[in-house]
Amino acid sequence: MLKKITLDNFRSFKNRVTVELTKTSYNILSHNAADNGVLKGCIFVGANGSGKSTIIRGIKLLVDLLFSEEILDLGGFLCVFGESRHYSVEYEFIIENEVIRYSFEVDTEKELISEKLYLDDKMLLDRMDFSAKSYIADPNGADYRSEVSKDTLFLRTLYFNTKFASDPVLSEWIDFLKGSAYIN
């Protein structure tokens, strides 16, 4: 389940913004949270221009980058008010009581420039520009260069090549993402 998303210089958010999708101390709708405190679903309500769609697009972006057949224009997510040509997105999930953190950064001139994947603070994927190292199947790390594309998540490449067969938590995470739905 998605616990948190952090957007930096992304669409209408010039500054770093974190949205926590965990329950509060209010008793209203207390059954809307899983045992780990993460919301089972949520609705964003607010004034026009307050960032509701930006948050939803940030969430949807990961699913699109992993599973869409189309190549997305990554430059279209840069904040028009920001001074930097970089933006970043970080996701935190709770799967089987383990924390998965996945982040990527985009330079709108170079496309994807970094990706990081952690499982309970253990690095499993580290990408910088056109080289990447994966610790998913090999604890010593496997180096990749030719498989790294400027406009595709390396996480996607690893998933489609291995299906994360050696890691049931990552497999369940991807299945969760495939089954996710959003309405805008």
Q: Language-model segments: which ranges?
A:
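Pre-Walker A-like glycine/lysine-rich segment at the N-terminus of P-loop NTPase domains
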Residues: 1-60
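Short polybasic amphipathic segments
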Residues: 5, 87-92, 111-119
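Short strand-coil-strand connectors
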Residues: 8-11, 94-98, 120
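Electropositive, glycine-dotted interaction segments
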Residues: 101-184
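Short, mixed charged/polar active-site loops
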Residues: 14-16, 97-101, 123
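Intrinsically disordered, low-complexity boundary segments flanking structured domains
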Residues: 4-8, 78, 139-144
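Conserved P-loop NTP-binding catalytic core
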Residues: 37-43, 47, 56-109
